[in-house]
Amino acid sequence: MMAALYPSTDLSGASSSSLPSSPSSSSPNEVMALKDVREVKEENTLNEKLFLLACDKGDYYMVKEILEENSSGDLNINCVDVLGRNAVTITIENENLDILQLLLDYGCQSADALLVAIDSEVVGAVDILLNHRPKRSSRPTIVKLMERIQNPEYSTTMDVAPVILAAHRNNYEILTMLLKQDVSLPKPHAVGCECTLCSAKNKKDSLRHSRFRLDIYRCLASPALIMLTEEDPILGAFELSADLKELSLVEVEFRNDYEELARQCKMFAKDLLAQARNSRELEVILNHTSNDEPLDKRGLLEERMNLSRLKLAIKYNQKEFVSQSNCQQFLNTVWFGQMSGYRRKPTCKKIMTVLTVGIFWPVLSLCYLIAPKSQFGRIIHTPFMKFIIHGASYFTFLLLLNLYSLVYHEDKKNTMGPALERIDYLLILWIIGMIWSDIKRLWYEGLEDFLEESRNQLSFVMNSLYLATFALKEEAHNKFHDFADRKDWDAFHPTLVAEGLFAFANVLSYLRLFFYVYTSSILGPLQISMGRMLQDFGKFLGMFLLVLFSFTIGLTQLYDKGYTPKEQKDCVGIFCEQQSNDTFHSFIGTCFALFWYIFSLAHVAILCTRFSYGEELQSFVGAFIVGTYNVVVVIVLTKLLVAMLHKSFQLIANHEDKEWKFARAKLWLSYFDDKCTLPPPFNIIPSPKTICYMISSLSKWICSHTSKGKVKRQNSLKEWRHLNEKRDENYQKVMCCLVRRYLTSMRQKMQSTDQATVENLNELRQDLSKFRNEIRDLLGFRTSKYAMFYPRN
């Protein structure tokens, strides 16, 4: 029988020389006895082997014959092979759906049948298992199949449910079938949750608890599940990616897994947006506001561009979504507005347009102040024109700062409390305008969103320094009226402090120009790289300060006892030709010496001592400490800093287009609303538009207390609700179209890959096997059920 099973092997005629020698004829050191130490299951009978082999070959008629002959129940239809697979599992793996239906009708059972079908992504098998009804019951066995498998021998992770496994495979069709069965998922708790359930699970098995949370989030991050269960898939992907990013910082053991899932959610949102085919669909998607977000009622009634979804994408740091081509094209359209012809102009005309607007920006601001709703005012209101006008206003402010040093009077040099000049009052007007602009932005955006922008942080510090400068100048003018040489002034004289703050504020004012280069495709990526390098330098600074503090303490303790009295010193300072170690007698002096030693500005004599004879050991220790500092800081840490900066630059360079477009979009969005149209100092003048809005709001408030006003208010609310419902309905229609296109594109990608080729080959093999068995049965080649073991000539 075994020879028939293996016809290619001639066991009887095998040469004895080809077989290994018996252990008795060899030395014990030359052979190694092999023994199966695993659990040996009960060997199957011949009929059971035939039954499993027929299922594996896909022989429907043989399986049916064996099951019909098993009236006495001698055959164990739930038997398993050496791999632990029963007939149902084998049939599912081979995708023999007709045999699977036959086995289920005869009562074959498998606890993990549904999981095997989902894992193999056999959609037909999943459908059969979910809809199968036993002969003695009118209800399908779905309840048992949908239970979580807790068998550690199963190939997938423990505590796995069918819906979780289907989401891991990202199979849209299978998930659709499972969701019709009213399935549910346990809501994952926070990592630091101390509830009774989480405490018990952590105490019992912390690894299992963490892995189960990871499986749940891997399920939730499935694009197919997001499309099926989320009314707003884009918002769901945004929120889930933020949660996964936060989890990656907490559960560092699974950081790579959570970061990969967060990246998957970001790419899904980007790919879903890429399915938009026209500007109308993009407008509906990018202007949609969720129920949790504040809604601009006036903007909704006026059909104004609010770009709420785009602002939310920037808040959640969705760089892939914002830098997507469709989104960027829509942003360009909104950015130029009625100046759309500017992009098609030659370079010379572009420069002339910018210079003209930059020179006549005060006139343009006055025109908008007088007639904001006119055709000319609407052109000025476009984001592109606002950007140029605000930039020209800021350049004028910098010009006033340069003029400030030119109008400085030498005769007031020793005046302890000089009066403010005319240019000071001009600067104060600009500063008040910039502060008012920041206050309005803070009011509409909120403190958290306002402080997230580094541009707002720099503006806040700069304006605070200018306010402190002029406040100190005014205080000095009121308190001091004398003349004296500056060297006789107090170190913290208000005028001196004001000049120091003013100098630092001037530096920040010019550094603020870096934020304007984001609009340039050449300088923008360099600015982003510089910002990332500054972050890396902050990390490096913490390590450097620790090393500096360690060596400073050691050198100070070593040389403090050898401090030379002042009258015996030849000179002081680390740049002295006759330098001594007296620099190291204090903590501050040692810090300065070691810091400048990095830049080779400390004298070589820093290694010498002024100890007397017999204290060579202290001299050697001091030289060894400084030498070690030289190796650790000058050689190792500085090279580490260079490597960190190079890595940051390379990281930005690899994603240059994405990083630049995201940074540019953040800058552009600050000019899209109508909150800060006029630049400083014209924004501090009450405009007719503001007065009209105030009068309109006041009249509405007064009318709301009358009977007619209440009716009008109710009608306005009904109109607003109707528009809101219509907006949500349009959004759902567009989203359904995007989901269908996304599924179609994914199906086309799968058909063009090797996986589709393998699936086609499997289908061809199944068809050929089924055709062979049918022909054999029709021609009567099978004389007995054991004939399939024997080869035919």
Curated annotation (Swiss-Prot):
Domain of life: Eukaryota
Post-translational modification: Activation of PRKCA induces phosphorylation of TRPC1 and subsequent Ca2+ entry into cells.
Residues in compartment: Extracellular: 405-422, 476-496, 559-623
Per-repeat ranges for ANK: 46-75, 83-109, 111-156, 158-180
Subcellular location: Cell membrane
Function text: Forms a receptor-activated non-selective calcium permeant cation channel. Forms a heteromeric ion channel with TRPC4 or TRPC5 that has reduced calcium permeability compared to the homomeric TRPC4 or TRPC5 channel. Also permeable to monovalent ions including sodium, lithium and cesium ions.
Assembly behavior: Heterotetramer with TRPC4 and/or TRPC5. Forms a heteromeric ion channel with TRPC4, with a 1:3 TRPC1:TRPC4 stoichiometry. Unlike other TRP channel proteins, does not form a homomeric channel. Interacts with TRPC4AP. Interacts with ITPR3. Interacts with MX1 and RNF24. Interacts with FKBP4. Interacts with PLSCR1. Interacts with PKD2L2. Forms a heterotetramer with PKD2 with a 2:2 stoichiometry; has distinct channel properties separate from PKD2 or TRPC1 homomers alone.
Name of the protein: Short transient receptor potential channel 1
Source organism per UniProt: Bos taurus
